[in-house]
Swiss-Prot record:
This is Probable ATP-dependent RNA helicase DDX6. Residues 308-468 form the Helicase C-terminal domain. A motif (Q motif) lies at residues 96-124. The gene is DDX6. Sumoylated. PROSITE patterns: DEAD_ATP_HELICASE (PS00039), HELICASE_ATP_BIND_1 (PS51192), HELICASE_CTER (PS51194), Q_MOTIF (PS51195). One of its GO terms (biological process) is miRNA-mediated gene silencing by inhibition of translation.
Length: 483
């Protein structure tokens, strides 16, 4: 049997004991900040060119000729309707439609073909303000449609007649950069020439330099790489009209804050800044006071945790953890799961154990080569494996809607880390399960995190109600079509 140390992602045979049955993961698409891609979307990606670090860029601009008066919606290639139940995190809206924002028809076509039917609360609040050119400071939960909240106005404001960089999206991790760029490319595919580029550390700098010789309208980047390209005079940002900081609390932490300050200083003074984050520490407030001009503040965080995520803990010794995990695998109906460890070494050891137990397993951590990380992320996102073991590298904004179970094999020390981890399930208002394996040394952290987040983590019951985390128990019936 192959072990988890294999350089290529290895798909072990799926065990038929439990809910982890043989066969591919069910595709589940949905509106919001992205989702697992439908077959139609995957076919679209197959017909595109791959540039630099694996990001997809349209080989030819797609143009759709719609005559005035045509019912253009009939020409759309819509993904299957998402019939899963959704929580008020995404359904508690004002009832607006995307058409209410006077968006370009070609942009609307991309929005609807992503499966985004109506704006989520964060999109309702953000889109009209961002279109007006005003700075935004938005606090919203992960998994509620933040990517769409800034990408839609960003794309609407592009002038495709110009050949310079007009917008930048800065994100803290390479995986998030690739995810956001793929969403951006898909949404803009009917716009006739919107050029999107992702650039991250760990990839070929020469490839990025060559790509920037051609027209690029939108750059989605990690902080260090884009600053390097700006300083080299390769990325010319003197025409940038909008910059987005996604996961702003991480971007403005001690690791990145000076880089972000340097990036902002290179931009025009009249640029628009959009900040999105689930938490707003003092560093974000300080940055806002220095660089944002009368920002419009959005706060959709009455409570910090996603409403669709049920949280449990199980008291175990360190030696019992693998046995407990095996028991969970045998009893839970897992579509896809993410399992967190606190170190890269423990990730590899646990992935090997899971493979030896006979379960499908990938692993990912920051010490792996970027090429390998990209491949694992892509394959897991597309449902080639049920279980992913990882470090906190994989917590920020990663949107894989097929994930319905998150397991903290190692309990985190910080409430912020816990919040981002469990946000891996219950994406875009769907249901999910978060299970924490708690040792004697973790008991004080458990209590502290409960108090800081104002949430309740319950003892795990002997049987977990599948209606709490299995979408099929709540899927809306498909109405019979009338003859």
């Amino acid at each position: 049997m192959s072990t988890a140390r294999t350089e290529n992602p290895v798909i072990m045979g799926l065990s038929s004991q439990n809910g982890q049955l043989r066969g591919p993961v069910k595709p589940t698409g949905g509106p919001g900040g992205g989702g697992t891609q439908t077959q139609q979307q995957m076919n679209q990606l197959k017909n595109t060119n791959t540039i630099n670090n694996g990001t997809q860029q349209q080989a030819q601009s797609m143009t759709t000729t719609i005559k005035p008066g045509d019912d253009w919606k009939k020409t759309l290639k819509l993904p299957p309707k998402d019939l899963r139940i959704k929580t008020s995190d995404v359904t508690s809206t004002k009832g607006n439609e995307f058409e209410d924002y006077c968006l370009k028809r070609e942009l609307l076509m991309g929005i609807f073909e992503m499966g985004w039917e109506k704006p989520s609360p964060i999109q309702e609040e953000s889109i009209p303000i961002a279109l007006s050119g005003r700075d935004i400071l938005a606090r919203a939960k992960n998994g509620t449609g933040k990517s769409g909240a800034y990408l839609i106005p960003l794309l609407e404001r592009l002038d495709l007649k110009k050949d310079n960089i007009q917008a930048m999206v800065i994100v803290p991790t390479r995986e998030l950069a690739l995810q956001v760029s793929q969403i951006c490319i898909q949404v803009s595919k009917h716009m006739g020439g919107a050029k999107v580029m992702a650039t991250t550390g760990g990839t070929n700098l020469r490839g990025d330099i060559m790509r920037l010789d051609d027209t690029v309208h939108v750059v989605i980047a990690t902080p260090g790489r884009i600053l390097d390209l700006i300083k080299k005079g390769v990325a010319k940002v003197d025409h940038v009209q909008m910059i987005v900081l996604d996961e702003a609390d991480k971007l403005l932490s001690q690791d990145f804050v000076q880089i972000m300050e340097d990036i902002i200083l290179t931009l025009p003074k009249n640029r628009q800044i959009l900040l999105y984050s689930a938490t707003f520490p003092l560093s974000v407030q300080k940055f806002m006071n220095s660089h944002l001009q009368k920002p419009y503040e959005i706060n959709l965080m009455e409570e910090l945790t996603l409403k669709g995520v049920t949280q449990y803990y199980a008291y175990v010794t360190e030696r019992q953890k693998v046995h407990c995990l095996n028991t969970l695998f045998s009893r839970l109906q897992i579509n896809q799961s993410i399992i967190f460890c606190n170190s890269s070494q423990r990730v590899e050891l646990l992935a090997k154990k899971i493979s030896q137990l006979g379960y499908s397993c990938f692993y990912i951590h920051a010490k792996m080569r970027q090429e390998h990380r990209n491949r694992v992320f892509h394959d897991f996102r597309n449902g080639l494996c049920r279980n992913l073991v990882c470090t906190d590298l994989f917590t920020r904004g990663i949107d894989i809607q097929a994930v319905n179970v998150v397991i903290n094999f190692d309990f985190p020390k910080l409430a912020e880390t816990y919040l981002h981890r469990i946000g891996g399930s219950g994406r875009f208002g769907h249901l999910g399960l978060a299970i924490n394996l708690i040792t004697y040394d973790d008991r004080f952290n458990l209590k502290s995190i409960e108090e800081q987040l104002g949430t309740e983590i319950k003892p795990i019951p002997s049987n977990i109600d599948k209606s709490l985390y299995v979408a099929e128990y709540h899927s809306e019936p498909v109405e019979d079509e009338k003859p």
